[in-house]
């Protein structure tokens, strides 16, 4: 009942109006899994490769017809009659068929869409939710927890057309007792921020991830406005709400000058200076998490930052680790960062993603499951966060259905499992001393 009978791939549109790959996996017994691949804007250089057509006559060269053809003509043949419940076997067949380190032959976007669709079809054949099937693949059957959200309310950097250099300013509702309550708190603060921006005559347009994207004088002004917005609600910054930022510092780094340039403020920092700039921000505001606070290749800078901030702040490696267990192991050995951001399409299969999560947990690193700036309505990351008890999720703001689809799935899962079987640990999930 779980043998793959056919795979159909197609080109669909993501949240930025760019093409991406969707795969439909059919099993004996009529079970079907449907999944699509997301796409990033600020990407790590060691991420698995996203295959694009490069045909300027279609979608400005961003079409994915090649990837679709490779699924329909090669991957589908290689996987026909294979058991969809053997996720590792399925993924390794595709990895071997590709034969490259970075999945450049078949494309991570092609491989991932099939990998996730296989998992969904297998879950359907077992008549269980995706999160429960993922827990079984992860060898943690029946073990679940609900993640604390990182809710992006101001977008900057490559995620918005504005002058803010830090890419994401996020809130974490630490006083919430359930994920549903944390989402409600996030919504209330999001709307309070929107009203405040209107009062100040600022733009309330949103960026790629649904957060507001106003032009501001500095990164500190963004933090001040968030602080003011929270004061308009019944919540207290520091007590109910903590802050998180994603610097995406690789996008700020000039390799020739070895400087981090904040163009919006017209200031530059050396590696150590940038760490101390972030340290001052975290002393002035209740920032509990800093993502990619150095360039991905500046491991000495990351090591220094970890020595300075690692005992107080959650230091998250995104471009640094690219969901790659081998790179993560090197970072763990060197004592770099204390948490990892998990993005399925950085590595390209569900199996390798689960391996990265296991590696992080074994080293007591924090785990944050993440979306990409180019998303679809696929809500698999919600199930992934629950099925691996990852503890935190980062999936954008409280606008744009490509973001809210994940929050809504978390609400459904929590309702289905109840707090007894899927506890919400809140602040305890953050690798921070606060």
UniProtKB/Swiss-Prot annotation:
GO terms for biological process: glycolytic process. One of its GO terms (molecular function) is magnesium ion binding. It is found in: Cytoplasm; Secreted; Cell surface. This is Enolase. It holds the Pfam family Enolase_N. NCBIfam families: eno. InterPro entries: Enolase, Enolase-like_C_sf, Enolase-like_N, Enolase_C, Enolase_CS, Enolase_N. Its EC number is 4.2.1.11.
């Amino acid at each position: 009942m779980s043998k793959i009978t056919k795979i159909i791939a197609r080109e669909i549109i993501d949240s930025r109006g760019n093409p991406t790959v969707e795969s439909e996996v059919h099993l004996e017994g009529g079970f079907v899994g449907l999944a699509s691949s997301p796409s990033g804007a600020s990407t790590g250089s060691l991420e698995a490769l996203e295959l694009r057509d490069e045909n300027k006559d279609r979608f400005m060269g961003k079409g994915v017809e090649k990837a679709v053809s490779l699924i329909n003509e090669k991957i589908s043949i290689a996987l026909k009659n294979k058991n969809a419940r053997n996720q590792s076997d399925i993924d390794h067949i595709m990895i071997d068929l590709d034969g490259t380190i970075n999945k450049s032959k078949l494309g991570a976007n092609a491989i991932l869409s099939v990998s996730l669709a296989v998992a969904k079809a297998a879950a359907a054949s077992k008549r269980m939710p995706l999160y429960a099937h993922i827990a079984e693949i992860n060898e943690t059957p029946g073990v679940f927890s609900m993640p604390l959200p990182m809710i992006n309310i101001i977008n900057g950097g490559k995620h918005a057309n504005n002058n803010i250099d830090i890419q994401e300013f996020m809130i974490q509702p630490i006083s919430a007792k359930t994920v549903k309550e944390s989402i409600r708190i996030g919504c209330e603060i999001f709307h309070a921020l929107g009203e405040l921006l209107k009062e100040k005559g600022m733009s309330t347009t949103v960026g790629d991830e649904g957060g507001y994207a106003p032009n501001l004088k500095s990164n500190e002004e963004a933090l001040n406005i968030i602080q003011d917005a929270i004061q308009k609600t019944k919540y207290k910054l520091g007590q109910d709400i903590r802050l998180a930022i994603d610097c995406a510092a690789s996008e700020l780094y000039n390799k020739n000058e070895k400087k981090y340039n904040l163009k919006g403020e017209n200031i530059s920092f050396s590696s150590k200076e940038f760490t101390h700039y972030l340290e001052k921000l975290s002393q002035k505001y209740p920032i509990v998490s800093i993502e990619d606070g150095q360039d991905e290749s500046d491991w000495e800078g990351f090591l220094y930052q970890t020595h300075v901030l690692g005992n107080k702040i959650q230091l998250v490696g995104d471009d640094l680790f690219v969901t790659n267990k081998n790179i993560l192991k090197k970072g763990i050995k060197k004592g770099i960062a204390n948490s990892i951001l998990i993005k399925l399409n950085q590595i390209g299969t569900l199996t390798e993603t689960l391996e990265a999560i296991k590696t992080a947990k074994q080293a007591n690193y924090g785990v944050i499951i993440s979306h990409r700036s180019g998303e679809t309505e696929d809500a698999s990351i919600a199930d992934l966060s629950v099925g691996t008890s990852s503890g935190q999720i980062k999936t954008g703001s409280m606008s744009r259905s490509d973001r809210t689809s994940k929050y809504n799935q978390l609400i459904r899962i929590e309702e289905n499992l109840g707090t007894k079987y899927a506890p919400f640990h809140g602040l305890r999930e953050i690798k921070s001393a606060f």
